[in-house]
């Protein structure tokens, strides 16, 4: 089958399924999701076997430890996937929600309700759990989805889609509701981006190269899950009891994800900078240090200006020393990708200036950047974290997979 025929076949299947999905009852959708959660746990052995194939390929390709961690599925992560699906099932169904109701002076009755977007295409890398998260969110919100995962997670994604399809078949629902792109060659992606009548939105989540590729080639609206160059500023008035736990968690807990801190900004008036750097080194973090920090911790490496713009997704951290809040804010303006910025301070006025001066999807005070996540925000899961400003910003959850239709009821009115 030629590329264009393959693409149009998948897109047409999704479009057809979307017409049925928008009419499914909440109870039917929830039944499917709860059955899927149970099946993920029941068939975990099959999932782990498929994941082992991906991990084996990853080792042969010499993927970094952080990327291997993103790829890894274990029993705990499978149960976590199942739990996320149950959380999505428990969320209120946004479809049909009335966002506005009004009777006009001429007697016309206007009711605006939430409706599905239609067909959502998501392109992602490495993390197999995205397959389930996005599939479940799309299904619950009445959307068909086209999922194109990275080649490094092919076998894991394949088995997860298979299990989803088993449930759909059992419940007599079109498997076009969740479409899997089983071609990993990038040349197969471009024809998808031309299907303006069949796909309603494209969501790329991955590295800078993927985001640029999709943005430059798509004729379909794109919601970008761009790179996470997250900045964490330690103010001179930061509480030392909070600093080390927050910084360690922000960098070390899962370095291979987009809400991990990449730039640590230290006010030179903070008295425990050396202890903080030593604590990070003890956790295995490779420190890229400016001259001031290097003087405190000579075992680090000199930082390059380009490092401050990098999303490492690894146990590497760039450090910048500043002498004022204004200098910290100027640095963040130059380096931020618009994802997450955080401050640790006990000065409420400093915190207020920090948050009022910056323009990112999330701004945190005295807590880890790792909290910028759909699950942590109470959304159940997320399609991605949008760093753009149109359609949605921040975690893209159920409600963000909807648009609105206004229903107007009259009694013979005409416009004068």
UniProtKB/Swiss-Prot annotation:
Substrates-to-products reaction catalysed: L-glutamate 5-semialdehyde + phosphate + NADP(+) = L-glutamyl 5-phosphate + NADPH + H(+)
Enzyme Commission identifier(s): 1.2.1.41
Subcellular location as annotated: Cytoplasm
GO terms under biological process: L-proline biosynthetic process
Class of the enzyme per the UniProt entry, highest EC level: oxidoreductase
CDD domains recorded: ALDH_F18-19_ProA-GPR
Gene Ontology cellular component terms for the protein in this record: cytoplasm
GO molecular function, one term: glutamate-5-semialdehyde dehydrogenase activity
Family assignment from sequence similarity: Belongs to the gamma-glutamyl phosphate reductase family.
Name of this protein: Gamma-glutamyl phosphate reductase
Species, as recorded: Leptospira interrogans serogroup Icterohaemorrhagiae serovar Lai (strain 56601)
